[in-house]
Amino acid sequence: MADAAVIEKLEAGFKKLEAATDCKSLLKKYLTKEVFDKLKDKRTSLGATLLDVIQSGVENLDSGVGIYAPDAEAYTLFAPLFDPIIEDYHVGFKQTDKHPNKDFGDVNSFVNVDPEGKFVISTRVRCGRSLQGYPFNPCLTESQYKEMEAKVSSTLSSLEGELKGTYYPLTGMSKEVQQKLIDDHFLFKEGDRFLQAANACRYWPAGRGIYHNDNKTFLVWVNEEDHLRIISMQMGGDLGQVFRRLTSAVNEIEKRIPFSHHDRLGFLTFCPTNLGTTVRASVHIKLPKLAANREKLEEVAGKYNLQVRGTRGEHTEAEGGIYDISNKRRMGLTEFQAVKEMQDGILELIKIEKEM
């Protein structure tokens, strides 16, 4: 049972949402009085309540989604709120659907999407993972953060070959190392207001860190938004090489660290937008002719379920006609299918750009 003080805060938060007529978040759309009354006094075995789930969206009425999962159990206990939001965000993934098992497929079927090097500046594939047996950010204690960091850093330090590298803890990091990581665009900052309000940044920077290999093509963020963000990237358009590196890293790490997985939802993450495959495959790409015809660009992107963003990510402009283009779908399809869809879409965009 949630305690009286929590329920009081929840009631106030619900009133605030109800009164916010211009709020367009999925939280507002799906947290009906009926759902609210059903969930307000529930509590996970780790002590998380509905307040942990919705507080970021109550605080930030301009949220797109507005909810986070404080622990793995929250996805089941608070399913009457999570399920419709997941179905709405991950278009086509119905509440009766089951996410397929992990399948990287034939990684050799991925290619260099731009062998001439005229369009694609860089290619990146990332996935998120949570460690089994640990809650997500809002419920973690400082000692759990440190315990997880110790487990992860020792696992990463044992990687060999191309993945061999160095772990840099944020705690006690020297100014020189910090600057070097900023220059390489590797350093993550303390969370934005959405993550702050979700209590995702407690005990900062305890347990947080960055690992990268010697040639800076493989990167792991430890305890940023998710327990692990595993990233493979390089200049140019060789998606095959980037994806192969990612899959071999994930498979190596998984041998030593069990990940949080849900029968219906796939791999679990702090934010419900990343569930399922958790995979985001993206390129920074110059498409000057299509950039002048944004409608055509969006039309092709829509056909292949691609998301088009500005160069610096969400809500930014395309600097010098350079776009960040990635797969949109994360749920209800395999890792292989998600990356294949992105590859097909990018090849099509390049073909159209050449013909214009």
From Swiss-Prot:
This entry carries the following GO cellular component terms, namely: extracellular space
Which CDD domains does its entry note?
A: arginine_kinase_like
- List UniProt keywords, sorted A-Z: Allergen, ATP-binding, Kinase, Nucleotide-binding, Transferase
Q: Where does L-arginine bind?
A: G64, V65, G66, I67, Y68, E225, C271, E314
InterPro entries reported in the protein's UniProt record: ATP-guanido_PTrfase (IPR000749), ATP-guanido_PTrfase_AS (IPR022415), ATP-guanido_PTrfase_cat (IPR022414), ATP-guanido_PTrfase_N (IPR022413), ATP-guanido_PTrfase_N_sf (IPR036802), Gln_synth/guanido_kin_cat_dom (IPR014746)
One Pfam family it belongs to = ATP-gua_PtransN
Enzyme Commission no: 2.7.3.3
State the oligomer form and interacting partners: Monomer.
Name of the protein in its database record: Arginine kinase Lit v 2.0101
Q: What is the lineage of its organism?
A: Eukaryota, Metazoa, Ecdysozoa, Arthropoda, Crustacea
